[in-house]
């Protein structure tokens, strides 16, 4: 494998192990020419997929592009990297094992939305707003209404929790001041 630092062709594998979900082999490599160290991943690719865009244009499926689009939706969200990797691997595996050499970008978008909905509601809304090309606040309201009504009979939103506290009273008005969360200094 070519060294990404100096272009040398004689790199050596120093460590090799399966990834956490066993869907890839992680290899730690070193270049004897420059001493550079880097990591590669080896994954099974069942077939070469072609993505059919909305315009009709055909492009090769790019797993890294799928990863990047999910990463953008999940930016600054508390989701572990291994859960994101499992989502990306699951979508790629589902597409590759689907039996079709061509897959529409809409089908990929729907799989991503389905996966993000199970992973993180905020990321789901972020992705959906771009994927569905939201133009007005009403588009968000409709999506949030469907999201809040999911899983309830008739799609009704959850009723407010009776045990949930109301707005906190201001200090000195007979209520307690809201608790402050400790900040981590990372």
Swiss-Prot record:
Q: Which cofactor does it need?
A: Zn(2+)
Q: Where is the composition biased (Basic and acidic residues)?
A: 12-24
Q: How is the cofactor bound?
A: Binds 1 zinc ion.
Q: Which domain of life is it from?
A: Bacteria
What InterPro entries does the entry give? ATP-cone_dom, NrdR-like_N, RNR_NrdR-like
Q: Where is this region: Disordered?
A: 1-24, 146-186
Instruction: Give GO BP annotations, semicolon-separated.
Output: negative regulation of DNA-templated transcription
Q: Where are the zinc fingers (unnamed)?
A: 3-34
For this UniProt record, the keywords arranged alphabetically read as follows: ATP-binding, DNA-binding, Metal-binding, Nucleotide-binding, Repressor, Transcription, Transcription regulation, Zinc, Zinc-finger
Stored Pfam families: ATP-cone, Zn_ribbon_NrdR
Ranges of residues in domain ATP-cone: 49-139
Family, according to the entry, reads as follows:
Belongs to the NrdR family.
Functional summary from the UniProt entry: Negatively regulates transcription of bacterial ribonucleotide reductase nrd genes and operons by binding to NrdR-boxes.
Protein name in the entry: Transcriptional repressor NrdR
Gene name in the database record: nrdR
């Amino acid at each position: 494998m070519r060294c990404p630092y100096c272009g040398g062709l004689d790199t050596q594998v120093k460590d090799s192990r399966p990834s956490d979900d066993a869907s890839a082999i992680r290899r730690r490599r070193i270049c004897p020419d420059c001493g550079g160290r880097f990591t590669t991943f080896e994954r099974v690719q069942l077939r070469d997929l072609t993505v059919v865009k909305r315009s009709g244009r055909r492009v090769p499926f790019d797993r890294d592009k799928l990863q990047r689009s999910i990463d953008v939706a999940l930016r600054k969200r508390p989701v572990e990297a291994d859960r994101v990797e499992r989502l990306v691997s699951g979508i790629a595996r589902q597409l590759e094992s689907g039996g079709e050499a061509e897959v529409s970008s809409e089908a990929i978008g729907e799989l991503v939305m389905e996966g993000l909905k199970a992973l993180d509601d905020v990321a789901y809304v972020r992705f959906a707003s771009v994927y569905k090309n939201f133009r007005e606040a009403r588009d968000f309201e409709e999506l949030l209404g469907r999201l809040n009504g999911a899983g309830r009979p008739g799609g009704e939103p959850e009723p407010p929790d009776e045990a949930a506290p109301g707005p906190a009273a201001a200090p000195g008005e007979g209520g307690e001041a809201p608790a402050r969360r400790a900040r981590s200094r990372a």
